[in-house]
């Protein structure tokens, strides 16, 4: 598991990002992302595998002081998380 945490000072109401499998993901590889607002789980993305098309994930983070993104990979899963946007 990998994670990144950011202080956002209660300035944002939502986050959006895109998820796709990386080109060298293994056949059985999967992954997903969990979004935490002040250490409370607010969104879990669908599981992404080798044949998954791009998906967009949106999470409500209204009133959060801290934002954490946690990446979970299994069996050679490799994901690209892109187009991350915070919305006021």
Predicted feature residues:
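Gly-Asp-aromatic-enriched flexible segments
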Residues: 1-88
């Amino acid at each position: 598991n990998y994670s990144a945490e950011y202080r956002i000072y209660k300035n944002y109401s939502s986050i959006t990002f895109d998820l796709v499998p990386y080109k060298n993901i293994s056949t059985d590889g999967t992954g997903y992302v969990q979004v935490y607002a002040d250490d409370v789980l607010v969104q879990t993305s669908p599981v992404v595998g080798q044949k998954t098309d791009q998906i967009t994930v949106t999470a409500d983070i209204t009133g959060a002081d801290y934002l954490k993104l946690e990446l979970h990979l299994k069996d050679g899963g490799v994901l690209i998380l892109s187009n991350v946007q915070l919305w006021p």
